[in-house]
Amino acid sequence: MSDASKLDNILAALADPTRRAILLRLSRGDARVTDLAAPFAISLNSVSKHIRILERARLVERRRRGREHVLSRNNHALNEAAAWIETLQAKWHSRIDRLEKALDEEES
């Protein structure tokens, strides 16, 4: 999978408020799938679909503990998205700085 495809998967996964809430919960520590599903007014099957999307984007990792599935957040994928956003932000700041400089020169 290309870096662009990986980033697309990460950003698409982050676009959904339920998936963001799951990641926020996992920021407090590992959790069982059933525990993650509890606060949502949707079926366990729907929560499982959201979790699979997060897994495909490498935002969460699953491991088995007996019969239970335990999830943890993968900060590496979040860091990749943050790095891309920071690069984009730096480019826009540079463009805005050049525009401000050009406007200042016109006023002088």
What is the predicted role of each segment?
Residues 12, 24, 55, 61, ...:
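A cross-family signal for key residues in well-ordered alpha-helices
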Residues 51-52:
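Short, hydrophobic-biased segments on the C-terminal half of alpha helices
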Residues 1-6, 24, 79-108:
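Amphipathic alpha-helical dimerization/coiled-coil segments
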Residues 2-45, 68-83:
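N-terminal helix-turn-helix DNA-binding core of bacterial DNA-binding proteins
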Residues 55-66, 70-72:
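Beta-hairpin "wing" of winged helix-turn-helix
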